[in-house]
Amino acid sequence: MVTVIDTLARPRHPEKANRPETEVLRKPDWIRVKAPGSAGWSQTAEIVRANGLHTVCEEAGCPNIGECWEKKHATFMIMGDTCTRACAFCNVRTGMPEALDQGEPQKVGDAVAKLGLSHVVITSVDRDDLADGGAEHFARTIAAIRKASPGTTIEILTPDFLRKDGALEVVVAARPDVFNHNLETVPAKYLSVRPGARYFHSLRLLQKVKELDGSIFTKSGIMVGLGEERPEVLQLMDDLRSAEVDFITIGQYLQPTRKHHKVERFVTPDEFKAYETVAYAKGFLMVSASPLTRSSHHAGDDFEKLRAARVARLGRS
């Protein structure tokens, strides 16, 4: 995917302008993706454009966009295309966001219905400028999808709602099928990778979802290749299991630009397989670990596996 950006009129990452450029490592042979351009990709793009929507597939430069859009799978990014945070790994535009589009929930619902999605993932930028962090907008979007496409299961990937009292309760009350909030990396890397967030706040957020509604599946993802050590990843798994998180995703960090955090190393497929084995042994219902794993990749298929795993373990869906 190629994104054309008017860097003179509106810099995408103004906070990174004065950062030194970092070394970009050559990608290994196991990181190869299909270029977008199929008929399914074009139809998905047309529906997204017609409804004036944003997708994290495009904004974050996801390597799987060709595969997912060909299948008419898209992860909708609500509340605009501009984030109030400036994470060192992320390609989403940063700055002061515009006012919320109050018609967006309905537009998302309509797009889900037109695409005929059995499962949809809704994410957002961070909106620290809003009193509730966008919680009510999430709830309205979930309700709009339920109305427009009643058979669609809904997965949300939320910000951390840091210092937004009562926000999580609003989102959980809307009853998504899956609540995903990514830890992104191990705690020792937060200051350099995710400086606006707090590791234990994010962990507590996931734990509280289960306390509020135990029927909702919880999910979290991390990137590797940022300089973390294996014991740190294993401890993170233990932390997530202590918070009763059902599903963990582990993928390779890929550097968007030379101004972003560098890739310290490329984790091998065998190492990902080893992480998967350990994660299942620690009690996760579902694990996705591979170089190209992303939070929303194969989300629909993974949801069915997740539901089946809970039935097998607990006797309920």
UniProtKB/Swiss-Prot annotation:
Main location: cytoplasm
Entry-linked InterPro entries: Aldolase_TIM, Elp3/MiaA/NifB-like_rSAM, Lipoyl_synth, rSAM
Free-text comment on the cofactor: Binds 2 [4Fe-4S] clusters per subunit. One cluster is coordinated with 3 cysteines and an exchangeable S-adenosyl-L-methionine.
Domain of life: Bacteria
Reactions the enzyme catalyzes: [[Fe-S] cluster scaffold protein carrying a second [4Fe-4S](2+) cluster] + N(6)-octanoyl-L-lysyl-[protein] + 2 oxidized [2Fe-2S]-[ferredoxin] + 2 S-adenosyl-L-methionine + 4 H(+) = [[Fe-S] cluster scaffold protein] + N(6)-[(R)-dihydrolipoyl]-L-lysyl-[protein] + 4 Fe(3+) + 2 hydrogen sulfide + 2 5'-deoxyadenosine + 2 L-methionine + 2 reduced [2Fe-2S]-[ferredoxin]
TM region positions: none
Location in the cell: Cytoplasm
Keywords on record: 4Fe-4S, Cytoplasm, Iron, Iron-sulfur, Metal-binding, S-adenosyl-L-methionine, Transferase
Domain called Radical SAM core: residue spans: 69-285
Family: Belongs to the radical SAM superfamily. Lipoyl synthase family.
Identification of the protein by name: Lipoyl synthase
